[in-house]
Amino acid sequence: MDKKTSRLRRATRARKKIQELGVNRLVVHRTPRHTYAQVISPANVVLAAASTAEKAVSEQLKYTGNVDAAKAVGKTVAERAIEKGVAVVAFDRSGFKYHGRVAALADAAREAGLKF
């Protein structure tokens, strides 16, 4: 089993557990160049989203694939979710280690007011 398959299996297990709970989830995806975050309802409707691929976020940054960029995405997605009335979410790390950019995004979202 390769690295990607292992990550996807971990992600599937976590998503099934969050689905059983029936709460909104903050989903994180990362690539070498960008970081993406979405708040998704139990009915699989995207309520809020932010990424370093967006001009509004990326023009504040020097480089989009680092911890500082992830912090900016976390803060932005939290602000947008709170505007929509979502304050409590479950954190879905998509099988990625809770380290580096993923942890930075989570911490920034918490500081901006999301609870998880």
Swiss-Prot record:
Its GO biological process annotations read: translation
User: Which keywords appear in this protein's UniProt record, sorted alphabetically?
Assistant: Ribonucleoprotein, Ribosomal protein, RNA-binding, rRNA-binding
What's an example GO cellular component term for this entry? cytosolic large ribosomal subunit
For this protein, the record's InterPro entries field holds: Ribosomal_uL18_bac-type, Ribosomal_uL18_bac/euk
Per UniProt, what is one GO molecular function of this protein? structural constituent of ribosome
Residue ranges that the Swiss-Prot or TrEMBL entry lists as coiled coil: none
Q: Which domain of life is it from?
A: Bacteria
Q: Which family does it belong to?
A: Belongs to the universal ribosomal protein uL18 family.
Relate the assembly described in the record. Part of the 50S ribosomal subunit; part of the 5S rRNA/L5/L18/L25 subcomplex. Contacts the 5S and 23S rRNAs.
Family annotation (HAMAP family): Ribosomal_uL18_B (MF_01337_B)
- Say what the protein does: This is one of the proteins that bind and probably mediate the attachment of the 5S RNA into the large ribosomal subunit, where it forms part of the central protuberance.
Instruction: Output this protein's name.
Output: Large ribosomal subunit protein uL18
Q: Which organism is it from?
A: Shewanella piezotolerans (strain WP3 / JCM 13877)
Q: Which gene encodes it?
A: rplR
